[in-house]
Amino acid sequence: MSESSHVGLWNRCLEIIRDNVPESTYKTWFVPIVPLKYEDKTLIVQVPSQFFYEFLEDKFVDLLRKTLYKVIGDGTKLMYNVLVDKSSGATVNQESTTRSTAIPQSGLPRVDERKAPGLLRAPAVQDLDPHLNPNYNFETFIEGYSNKLSRSVAEAVAENPAKTVFNPLFLHGASGVGKTHLANAIGTRIKELYPDKRVLYVSAHLFQVQYTDSVRNNTTNDFINFYQTIDVLIIDDIQEFAGVTKTQNTFFHIFNHLHQNGKQLILTSDRAPVLLQGMEERLLTRFKWGMVAELEKPTVELRKNILRNKIHRDGLQFPSEVIDYIAENVNESVRDLEGIVISIMAHSTIYNKEIDLDLAQRIVRKVVRCETKAVTIDDIINVVCKHFDLESSAIHTKSRKREVVQARQVAMYLAKTHTDFSTSKIGKFIGNKDHATVLHACKTVKGQCEVDKGFRSDLENIETLLKKRNVSNGER
């Protein structure tokens, strides 16, 4: 068929769909769909992301099927061309089903994850599933001040595995800061650059399960031999080995063999080696042989960039004030940020709500642990002045003392971030300053955060105290 034919068919489908869904739903989920081809009773359309595809199949598959049958005829199939990498234009085809949530597979044979890998008898490289998540790559890992060092080291390891001083590479940080993503990204890049290398990603928990099974089945030697054939071993959540003596002993021998034979080890943990309790000293010593790199909690600006990236990759659109609100109020985990995006889209579609600040606030309140009362400028002034060891009245004076000026600027920045007051109002309430002074203060504080880790830490501590103060006030 000609291009006009498949475009025309889809446009007729859109007319029916538009009459059966709210306008906001139509614009969000159907306008971005691009018809590509119609042949053999199959309409092929392109959607902007895997998330987009899964959401359509979950919420609108019946509507799509009935519409296709009405416009084209019974038995018409719908095939999705999912855009998985916008920069390269890479796509993967997915067939519509009644309730499909399929995810693109690597094409490699998979094995029972509980089965001890030693029973595989060291399969050939092309038969070894590295168990990497292809969505966790360097292209989708958003860089900021809090993870810049870790990312740089990770890329160096990926470019030259076991050829740098970063062996082992020990990545640590709180839950949800990107350790698993970065570890997978290393493995994925290595497989791209060195397809003959045997790369394996495994969680510490799964490693323990496999080891226990090998003991039960009297195949421990096979288990150890298998792991000693790996060129790049990635173990996630290594802290789970704590207190498990036999597993630690076995891993110790595997570690030694790999390291002595020029193989790369990448380990992740929720804490630094020095804080790992219940771990043998000889292992802790080896964890520190190479590079220990921390991924800190993402800053507000990084959280905004992570949100923008996810929203763009998923082919969605959020108002900037919604992105800012989410980033400023959800600071525990990147996974929380991504979960909120999905929740907002679901609520918007199911309840026919516009994606606006009100909807975002209602969703975020369900995720954030404690709903706090509104922050006031007086709260901000009191907490800031206490931190700088100043009287609250000092902030309203014309003093040019360094600590007073800095306290005033921090208070203005926090007022801009945590209240709905205009910059003019903020200036009036804090030192009777003008709009331009407040803007300058905000710019100064942001700039100092980017270059001064100590200052950034102080600011985060002040924000934490501010939130605690208002939680306690709200509970009285």
Swiss-Prot record:
Residues binding ATP, per UniProt: G176, G178, K179, T180
SUPFAM superfamilies reported for this sequence: P-loop containing nucleoside triphosphate hydrolases (SSF52540), TrpR-like (SSF48295)
Molecular function GO labels: ATP binding; ATP hydrolysis activity; DNA replication origin binding; lipid binding
InterPro entries documented for this protein: AAA+_ATPase (IPR003593), Chromosome_initiator_DnaA (IPR001957), Chromosome_initiator_DnaA-like (IPR020591), Chromosome_initiator_DnaA_CS (IPR018312), DnaA_C (IPR013159), DnaA_dom (IPR013317), DnaA_N_dom (IPR024633), DnaA_N_sf (IPR038454)
Protein's GO biological process: DNA replication initiation; regulation of DNA replication
Region (Domain IV, binds dsDNA): 349-476
Region Domain III, AAA+ region: start-end pairs: 131-348
Places the protein is found: Cytoplasm
Span list, region Domain I, interacts with DnaA modulators: 1-87
Region listing for Domain II, in residue ranges: 87-130
Keywords: ATP-binding, Cytoplasm, DNA replication, DNA-binding, Lipid-binding, Nucleotide-binding
Domain of life, source organism: Bacteria
Transmembrane segments: none
Disulphide connectivity of cysteines: none
GO cellular component: cytoplasm; plasma membrane
Recorded domain comment: Domain I is involved in oligomerization and binding regulators, domain II is flexibile and of varying length in different bacteria, domain III forms the AAA+ region, while domain IV binds dsDNA.
Record family assignment: Belongs to the DnaA family.
Known partners and oligomeric status: Oligomerizes as a right-handed, spiral filament on DNA at oriC.
Function: Plays an essential role in the initiation and regulation of chromosomal replication. ATP-DnaA binds to the origin of replication (oriC) to initiate formation of the DNA replication initiation complex once per cell cycle. Binds the DnaA box (a 9 base pair repeat at the origin) and separates the double-stranded (ds)DNA. Forms a right-handed helical filament on oriC DNA; dsDNA binds to the exterior of the filament while single-stranded (ss)DNA is stabiized in the filament's interior.
Protein name per Swiss-Prot or TrEMBL: Chromosomal replication initiator protein DnaA
Organism from which the protein derives: Bacteroides fragilis (strain ATCC 25285 / DSM 2151 / CCUG 4856 / JCM 11019 / LMG 10263 / NCTC 9343 / Onslow / VPI 2553 / EN-2)
Lineage, uppermost ranks: Bacteria, Pseudomonadati, Bacteroidota, Bacteroidia, Bacteroidales
Primary gene name: dnaA
